[in-house]
Amino acid sequence: MVGKNFSGKQMSEAFINSAFLALSGGFQDAYTYNTRNEVFSNAQTGNVVLMSQHFMTGDWKAGVRYLLPLIAFVLGVFVADQIQMRYKYARRLHWRQGILLAEIVILFVVGFIPHSLNMTATIFVSFARAMQVQTFRKMGGYSYASTMCIGNLRSGTAAFSHYLQDKKTEQLKQAAYYFGIIFLFAIGAGLGGNLTEHFGIHMIWISCILLGLSFLLMFENE
């Protein structure tokens, strides 16, 4: 049976699984920013800011460059949610593993898309990232995001603040989980930025490897 449980929680929530997802998440954001015309695949707040700025100045073409990844992100969340509702109780393959396989295939294709089609590549990555963030929302029982930092930063800081007040070990553990994921996201982004700068568009395949490890991990018990 796939998608096994550990201590009443699904293996998809294990910290080690979240670590692979966070590394991949940081890598992908650095990849699209550095190799695909400085557009974020996941930091949609930044895309909203830049889109609005260009629209307000009448630069519609530049604004659309940031609008399309936003639309792709919305569609990715919608598709992942539909897959969950339809295949939540599938026994042959856990629905989360199905999402990972789809993401791996999409990112593998992106590695072949030339610079002349950078917008297409960014749209594909945004769609895949949205499916991931919608699919993996818990880590060790805590709500988190594997593809962005702001929510994790808030939650980690709040947990540490509560620990200073209450001195509960669980609160310190929670803070460590969140800051650990942020650190791993940053490592992924650093690697993504440097590797793509030196070796180009094919480096997105490293994210495929990381997601593949997450996929395989979900066959195991903790």
Predicted regions and their residues:
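Alpha-helical transmembrane segments of multi-pass membrane proteins
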Residues: 2-222
